[in-house]
Amino acid sequence: MMVIAGRIQTRPSTCGKEKFMKRMGMCIGLNADMVGEYKRLHAAVWPEVLARIQECGIRNYSIFLREPENLLFAYWEYHGSNFAADAAHMAADPKTQAWWKICDPCQQPLVSRKPGEWWAEMEEVFHCD
């Protein structure tokens, strides 16, 4: 998922701030020998992790797998006004950190990712409702 440099002690209030929806996509490689384990893990995501995802304004979240290349594509819709703060809030959660520690060995970050990224951000080039 997202790597945020540094730590934040408190979550900035979004009270009174206008919220918006933004479609987001990211991709990463999946180690060939970990495909089964990754699928097993995501068939039973921990409830605390799912709750934190919702709390941070992420909706309609899906992860797709492309085989035989073993590429993961994640899509979600962010409903909020400060994605960086919400991502940091998620990253500060001990249960989410434990989940990532289990999932990370399955993943192979793309060589072309930006510095500090685990999952590589993608540009939306087309959308049709």
Predicted regions and their residues:
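Active-site-flanking beta-strand signature of metal-NTP-handling nucleotidyl enzymes
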Residues: 24-29
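A general secondary-structure signal for short beta-strands and their flanking turns/coil
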Residues: 21-23, 69
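Charged phosphate-binding loop/patch that engages nucleotide di/tri-phosphates or the phosphate backbone
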Residues: 116-129
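Short, glycine- and small/hydrophobic-rich beta-strand elements in well-ordered beta-sheets
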Residues: 50-73, 77-79, 83
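Short, Lys/Arg-enriched N-terminal segments with co-localized hydrophobic residues
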Residues: 10-20
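An amphipathic, aromatic/His-enriched active-site/gating alpha helix that lines ligand/cofactor pockets
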Residues: 56, 78-118
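Short amphipathic alpha-helical segments
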Residues: 34-59
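Acidic, Ala/Val/Gly-enriched low-complexity intrinsically disordered segments
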Residues: 3-5, 18
